[in-house]
Amino acid sequence: MTDNAEILEPQGDHHAWFSLQPFLEAGKWSSTPGTYFKEMKEKNGGAPIYKAHPGLKVITITDHASGKWFFNQPDTVLDRQKGQRFGPLKCKEEYLGKGLPALVTNAMEKHEGARDYIVAVLRERLAATDTTLEHATANFYKDLWANGMGDYTTVYDLFLQQSYAFVLEWIFGMGEEGGQPLPPYKDFLTVNPADLSVLIGLEVDTPVANLVSMVAQAVAGGVSSEEKASIEVLLEAIRSSKMWPSFTKMLEESGLPTQDMDKMFMFFSGFQSSSALAKNMEYCVGSLAANPDFLAELRAELDGQELTIKSVSDAKRFPLLDSFHWEILRLYPAPQFFFKTAQMDLVVPTSSGARYQVRKGDMLCCHHPLIHIDEAVFGADATEFKPKRFIGNPGLKDDVFAYAFPKPSEPGRVGGMPWGCAAHTVGVLDGILKVFYGRWVQEAEWEMKEPPIIDPVEYLGVVGPDGLGFAKVTPRK
């Protein structure tokens, strides 16, 4: 790469105010991102950076060098969207109210302070992490072997039971022996379906397309009375938890707005349970089912071992589990999309050496899975699932922007600003995921309804098919 390379203008289309194309592109972007980005890249001659309009006018970043540049910029250079938004997706009023989605920080509207507050809450509960993880996991398998899967035969629905029990006990103390019971699982699943439809709606930046979007969502019916009732069940459980008075006091002392604080916690605990844990178990289960020889090796490594957050952090003791975990993070990172607005004119590098002009006010969309399949960094097999990829090559982990940032100079900091996943910032998310993976490998035999599909074009950033499900799950003998 050289600073002497010609500076190029991103090619592609940003559509006029009367065009319906932004609405159509948003639908394809959200439902079949692999197909959408493949078509966009081909349309723009294979360029790693190009204009697109999936509901919003964006400049798309798709290779490793540009992604690394993106994640290393402080909020004085690239800052988060205003409001409760993730690109064209907007949090619904019924779900989040006036609360802040404190997952990806910015300097605007106190997002940064809200995320710092969530980090402080997790640190308050850090000592309870291992005990609550073991309690929730033991109960999950005890119930599974006693009662079977019941109606919850998709991988997501099954493991959301384990993750919701853990997260709600860890953060709020719900489900502890002799304490406040967990809210009904059916209410949690209703509020946190795999497609996140209760949480988000679509808001497009061109008037005609946005009108069509609003009509389509109105026809679909919005948040149902059943969903509203389940939301209230979860909010009441949060407000009644033993930790709530302490969390309220901490927030008041922080100077942050307290309006809809309960909804902010519902959002955070729901996202951690669903996208950070249950979805990752889809990737774990599907990848292991597609790689039976590796599964046998992993079982040999894990059988008879006590798995705790501390023990699984030892990559030398559990090299296969560690490498498997990082390969999951590489191909299936979360969140998949990041939207940032340029605070000044910028020049973006790429893996090919080409450089692209970005101007103040441009919105950049960095697609997390695409930057992790760049052959310039991960080799000719970058699109393949290789669970031993990181064994003997631990430095390659620095090129996986786990939980939204490269390896930081200090925990949770890149360029002096907070970034990425709060649970990772406090140092436990890697361990939690490894325990989830490892206990499943130790405990279960399973058969899938359909063969898992690992194809970063057809199923970009996920394991296919949609609704990946079990035909049978039994305890190991």
Curated annotation (Swiss-Prot):
PANTHER family: ALLENE OXIDE SYNTHASE, CHLOROPLASTIC, CYTOCHROME P450 26. Heme binds at C421. SUPFAM superfamilies: Cytochrome P450 (SSF48264). The gene is EAS. Cytochrome P450 epoxyalcohol synthase involved in the metabolism of oxylipins 'ectocarpins' natural products, such as hybridalactone, ecklonilactones and derivatives. Isomerizes the hydroperoxides into epoxyalcohols via epoxyallylic radical. Pathway: Lipid metabolism; oxylipin biosynthesis. Belongs to the cytochrome P450 family. GO terms for biological process: fatty acid biosynthetic process; oxylipin biosynthetic process; sterol metabolic process. It comes from Ectocarpus siliculosus (Brown alga). This is Epoxyalcohol synthase CYP5164B1.
